């Protein structure tokens, strides 16, 4: 349905001092703090995790050498979604508006809607990361204590007990990440990179990572997290996280959180000869997800 003069009655008459409601500031591309972006030329993308070899055994004198097998462990799949929206203006609404350019006004509003949706889609991967049914290539949720390994063991990228963000829980996460292994149970020397928090935890994050001394104690101990550079990239606030208690760590494990861009944002317009209406649309195709769940650590909070 086209935007007509019926929706813009006040703008057909002189005397308005201001038009407002479409010029609010917006949050930036917060997904870039979490995801690695790659381009895609297919309707979907797949990435397969490989399993190497176990620790080498001792060979006894005169005995045969031991052989091991590498294999594929599992495959993660990214299905791109098409995100699109448009609006239409009647010829008369364009002609009779006394104030500003309707097309310029609403194309800005359209861009805002498209950008907002992208951030919601990106944050949804974390928001649903603890929810059964939102599984990755290994058959479990993004944040799980049972990421099974080819060797028969498991990796966990959640605390043993859901914990609020504090000094103890953050230090425990750093230690836990350092103990992750590959598919054959060899240590992988993983490290945290960045703390990602909702707005409600921004001040907690500042105190934990940026103060010189320990937080909330009467002791004169140093802040070990800051002194050791345990979270080298500091913290980022994501305003699209829905749980005010949940917090996350990105890690240096490669091929973790991925954003595939199938078709970049495209804007177009055309006119209808019969009605005189002018139509505008925006369209893009992308996907958000994860390949290796060890690219993130998460706690749902206590």
Name the predicted role of every residue range.
Residues 1-27:
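N-terminal alpha-helical "arm" segments
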Residues 2-10, 143-182, 189-194, 200-302:
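Sequence/fold signature of self-assembling virion shell proteins
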Residues 25-83:
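Assembly/oligomerization interface modules of large self-assembling protein complexes
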Residues 75, 183-185:
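A generic local secondary-structure boundary/capping motif
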Residues 75-133, 195, 280-282:
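Long, contiguous amphipathic alpha-helices that act as assembly "spine/axial" helices in icosahedral shell
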Residues 79, 102, 106, 162-165, ...:
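Short, contiguous, pocket-lining structural segments
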Residues 80, 96, 128, 136, ...:
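Generic structural "secondary-structure junction" signal
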Residues 118-154:
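Glycine-rich, mobile lid/loop segments that gate access to catalytic sites or pores
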């Amino acid at each position: 349905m086209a935007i007509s003069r019926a929706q813009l009655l006040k703008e057909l008459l002189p005397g308005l001092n201001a038009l407002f409601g479409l010029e609010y500031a917006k949050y930036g591309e917060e997904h870039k703090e979490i995801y690695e972006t790659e381009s895609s030329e297919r309707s979907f993308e797949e990435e397969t995790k490989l399993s190497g070899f176990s620790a080498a055994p001792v060979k006894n004198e005169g005995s045969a050498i031991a052989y091991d097998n590498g294999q594929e462990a599992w495959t993660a799949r990214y299905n791109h979604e098409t995100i699109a929206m448009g609006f239409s203006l009647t010829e008369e609404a364009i002609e009779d508006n006394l104030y500003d350019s309707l097309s310029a006004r609403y194309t800005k509003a359209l861009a805002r809607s498209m950008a907002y949706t992208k951030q919601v889609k990106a944050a949804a991967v974390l928001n649903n990361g603890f929810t059964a049914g939102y599984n990755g290539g290994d058959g479990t949720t993004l944040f799980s204590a049972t990421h099974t390994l080819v060797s028969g063991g498991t990796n966990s990228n959640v605390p043993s007990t859901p914990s609020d963000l504090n000094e103890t829980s953050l230090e425990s996460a750093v230690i836990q990440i350092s103990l992750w292994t590959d598919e054959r149970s060899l240590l992988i020397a993983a490290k945290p990179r960045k703390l990602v928090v909702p707005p409600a935890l921004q001040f907690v994050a500042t105190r934990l990572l940026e103060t010189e001394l320990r937080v909330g104690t009467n002791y004169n101990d140093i802040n070990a997290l800051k002194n050791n550079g345990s979270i080298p990239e500091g913290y980022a606030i994501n305003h699209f996280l829905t749980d005010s208690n949940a917090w996350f760590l990105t890690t240096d494990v490669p091929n973790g959180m991925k954003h595939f861009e199938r078709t970049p944002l495209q804007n177009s317009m055309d006119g209808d000869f019969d009605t005189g209406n002018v139509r505008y649309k925006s369209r893009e195709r992308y996907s958000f997800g994860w390949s290796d769940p060890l690219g993130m650590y998460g706690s749902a909070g206590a």
